[in-house]
């Protein structure tokens, strides 16, 4: 191939052959006769692209876009700058129908939204989490809190993927946002992950990478408190291989955390009233996560990936409180000291193989193994004014392991995508318990979990649909006996495109859920001088059903989504309090907290999201308001709660500067068993400045507050009602500095999409009592 003495450019406009509309986000490459990519670009919002500094006389221009036939054009460039004019791409006849629902690069498919980040969105973002915060206006149900580094979909958890491979949030944050080709967003549970309780999937499809690599370093340092978060990531590509390393570190020490509580114990001759007055307490958290990854691609249709990761955690809490107790006419006051420690480490190995047999079928195989070892201590020390003391020390030693195998076959039949999968998982937890120096007593539990599933997604006229079914076989074996269940899951969605502005989406989910191993441990643990905690081997799986409907409206840069949902959990898993009034019982006159099946819990929710992007070309505004009603029915009592919640956020852009804010007007409530929980208030505002390969930022968290981080819970009960408020003053008016450094280097090389997942381990340990 001849080399030009003077560099030229190649440009053009890519349009849809049928509609004649420009296609934004088309991936454009310049390829030599050896199929090596020399340079690449993407079309802008008007479908235009330009390849600059071309110094070869002849080459091929390749164009690729999801849902369209790829195209390769031979070009001769020795005559000077070349304008290819309009280039027409033809939609694939075998692809699912799709509708561009706005001018902002959003494609609504049967089972997901496909979003193409604009150049402005990419330039404004300092990293991937910041990009999601800007683009959430186009992603119904997505919530982002940059200060907490928390992402949720429809109020639930998220599975992150990179080119279809499941990754951690820290890995996603290490991506160079300019290398993101598109984002595939699902705000419905994938049947593959439905047994994990997640509400959505966010998949980042990356541009073909260059031989060479990337390095990213990010530091979050609080200057008004002791809090530090660091991430170091690197990836290197060479020929058919990819090596990656990702290290994350979180260190935090609080010296001003408080826990207030009001409790009643009902059952004895006189009600026991306890008022807990929080005193300055301390907490130290130190966690380290490191992962090493390797990917080998035999060809574009065959690949093998491996990942070895290690997590270590060391936590220490020292809680001090003053207790006021009233029993009849008697009043007492005592000091309560409650230290606890947690230390654990866990290595994990993932292996993954994928083979694409054709454009319509593929096979994925995944094997995972992990082990966990940890030591946990929980102490309770009371010092009464009368001079008497109460001391309790609980120790737990844990050794656990888990292994999983999964196979997934994907097949396209005409215009319908289908998947068929099976997953087998074995989880073994072995815990040894000791109280007050007594000999350790063992507890062993093993759970076998066989999960098989299938789904299909298609489109009929304007109606997109997905239907999924799955079956789960549980077998749980412990020292006290064994239980087994066979349960089925079902998931269905309907997505109807009303017109160019309106669309409606309906979801139905039926999901049985097995309790965690810790809830099925019937060993008795001492909480304090008058109360105990135990699990229940014979609790049954709960059954969760949900109906959700939302209507979406979009015109220009304005987005509005109205939501309504109803869910019910039958045989709900609740922590129920009892008073033992049997004189012959071992636990006579003790209050016992035991895991039981309740009748049901109900949740009715409404929500309205309003957003406007690029107001005056500088400002993005978002607001959400909603109402939740919860009903909890146990065998002996009924409780309910209804609350209104609201939040607002804003991002403003001025050149290389970004100013942002997130504020909770009224916090949302959730339900955990029988406990009503007010969401954590963690508001912030800040600014970022981008300079070359750096981003510098500063933000204030929980500004103009005295308590800072605050969480409230309410547990109604006829035996032991509890009201708690936990807050960390260290996080009040907290100032954080952020630095991101990212650099990429190398030549271009095409990689295949892949999936690699690790679902963690259930240790069976519960120290939250």
Regions found by a protein language model. Name each.
Residues 15, 29, 64-68, 82-122, ...:
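Short, acidic, small-residue-rich periplasmic hinge/interaction motif at the N-terminus
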Residues 33-48:
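Short, acidic Ser/Thr/Gly-rich low-complexity loop/linker segments typical of extracellular
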Residues 83-88, 102, 128-133, 150-151, ...:
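N-terminal periplasmic accessory domains that precede
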Residues 131, 165-190:
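Short acidic/polar hinge/loop motifs at secondary-structure boundaries
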Residues 132-165:
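Extracytoplasmic beta-strand/coil segments of soluble accessory domains associated
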Residues 287-314, 338-481, 485-491, 497, ...:
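Face-selective signature of the C-terminal outer-membrane beta-barrel domain
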Residues 475, 500-545, 566-585, 704-720:
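Surface-exposed extracellular loop regions of Gram-negative outer-membrane beta-barrel proteins
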Residues 512-561, 568-570, 590-604, 725-733:
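Outer-membrane beta-barrel signature, preferentially recognizing the C-terminal barrel domain
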